[in-house]
Design a protein with these regions (language model features):
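S-adenosylmethionine
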Residues: 138-143, 147-288
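Short helix-terminating capping/connector loops at secondary-structure junctions
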Residues: 18-21, 112-118, 241
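Alpha-helical elements of Rossmann-like donor-binding domains used by nucleotide-donor carbohydrate transfer enzymes
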Residues: 7, 27, 55-58, 98, ...
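N-terminal auxiliary segments of SAM/dcSAM-dependent transferases
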Residues: 1-76
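SAM-dependent Rossmann-like transferase core, predominantly class I methyltransferases
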Residues: 44, 57-140, 144-156, 172, ...
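Helix-turn-helix-type domain boundary/helix-start signal
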Residues: 14, 46, 89-90, 247
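An acidic site on a long C-lobe helix of protein kinase domains
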Residues: 52, 92-95, 227
Length: 288
C-alpha cells in the first residue's frame, strides 16, 4: 500500500504542493478503497481486485489531469457530513459552513421570538444542497425549500437530501427572474450565489477553472452584484417582518452588497468576517 501511496503522491506533486498531494493520495486510498493511513504507514499488504485496479487507474488519470479529488471520488465533506458531488455542482467549501452557522443562529432567534411560528426557509441557488440539507437537519421543525436553475444540480441535491434524511422541497427556479411569491411568505433566505468576476478567473486555480460549473461561479465584470440585487428585491417583497436575507459574498464587494440590500428596503445590513478575517457574508433584515 505504501508504494501505491508514494507513486500517486509523487505524480500529484506536479500539480499540487507536497502537503496537498499527500492529503489527496490519502483521501483516494481511504475513501475510495478503504485503505486507512495506518495501513499505509504500516505498508499493510492488500491485493486489489481487477475491478479495484481498473478504478484506481481511472482515478489516477483523472487526478493527474487536474480534476478535483472530490469529483473523482464523487463526494465531499461539509459540516461533518458527506455529500455527493459532480461537475454539475460546486464543491462545498468550509467557509460556507460559517454561513450555515449564522443562518441557524438567526433562525433560532426568530423561533425564540415566536415559539408558535412555523419557519419557512429558502436556500436560493442550492447546488449540492449542502446548505439546505444542513439547515433542515439542524432545524427539523422548519420548512426548507431549495431553488436552483440547474436540473443537474437539483438531481444531486435531491440525492443528498434523501441519503442524509432531510425533508427538503426542491424547485427549479431562476432567482434573477421575478419571484412571484406572496408577501411575507418566507422567514429566512440564505444564498451563496455566483460572485466571482470574470477578470478574477486568471488568478484562480486551474482545476477549479477547468472543472467546476462556471454558471455557479462567475458574474460579468460590469455587473458583479446582479444576483445580490435580485435577492434583495425578492427578499424585500417576500420576507416576513424581521425575516432575514443572509448571503456569502465576494470579499471585494462587502460594503457595496450591504448598500444594495439597504437600497432594496432591507434594514440593519451587517458584514461578517470569516475565520480568516475576510469579509465573507452580508445579511439584512425586513422592516417592521
Amino acid at each position: 500500500m505504501n508504494s501505491l501511496f508514494t507513486a500517486l503522491r509523487m505524480q500529484l506533486q506536479a500539480l499540487y504542493t507536497e502537503g496537498e498531494a499527500r492529503a489527496i493520495a490519502f483521501m483516494v486510498l481511504d475513501e475510495g478503497f478503504g485503505v486507512s493511513r495506518t495501513d499505509i504507514y504500516a505498508d499493510k499488504v492488500r491485493q486489489f481486485s481487477e475491478d479495484e485496479h481498473q478504478r484506481y487507474d481511472i482515478m489516477c488519470k483523472r487526478l493527474i489531469a487536474g480534476e478535483p479529488v472530490q469529483y473523482v471520488l464523487g463526494k465531499a465533506w461539509f459540516a461533518g457530513r458527506q455529500f455527493a458531488v459532480s461537475p454539475d455542482v460546486l464543491i462545498p467549501r468550509p467557509e460556507t459552513e460559517e454561513l450555515v452557522d449564522w443562518a441557524i443562529e438567526v433562525a433560532q432567534g426568530l423561533q425564540k421570538a415566536n415559539p408558535q411560528k412555523h419557519l419557512r426557509i429558502v436556500d436560493a441557488g442550492t447546488g449540492s444542497g449542502c446548505i439546505a440539507v444542513s439547515l433542515k437537519l439542524a432545524l427539523p421543525k422548519a420548512e426548507v425549500v431549495a431553488w436552483d436553475i440547474s436540473e443537474g444540480a437539483l438531481n444531486i441535491a435531491r440525492k443528498n437530501a434523501q441519503t442524509l434524511g432531510a425533508e427538503v422541497k426542491f424547485e427549479q427556479r431562476d432567482m434573477l427572474q421575478p419571484w412571484a411569491l406572496p408577501a411575507e411568505s418566507i422567514d429566512l433566505i440564505v444564498s451563496n450565489p455566483p460572485y466571482i468576476c470574470m477578470r478574477e478567473a486568471e488568478d484562480m486555480e486551474q482545476n477549479v477553472m477547468k472543472h467546476e460549473p462556471h454558471t455557479a461561479l462567475f458574474v460579468p465584470n460590469d455587473d458583479p452584484l446582479r444576483f445580490y440585487r435580485a435577492l434583495a428585491k425578492g427578499s424585500a417583497q417576500t420576507l416576513t417582518k424581521n425575516g432575514a436575507l443572509l448571503t456569502e459574498i465576494n470579499r471585494a464587494f462587502g460594503h457595496e452588497t450591504a448598500e444594495a440590500f439597504m437600497q432594496a428596503g432591507l434594514k440593519d445590513a451587517e458584514i461578517k468576517r470569516d475565520v480568516f478575517g475576510n469579509e465573507r457574508m452580508v445579511g439584512a433584515f425586513a422592516g417592521l
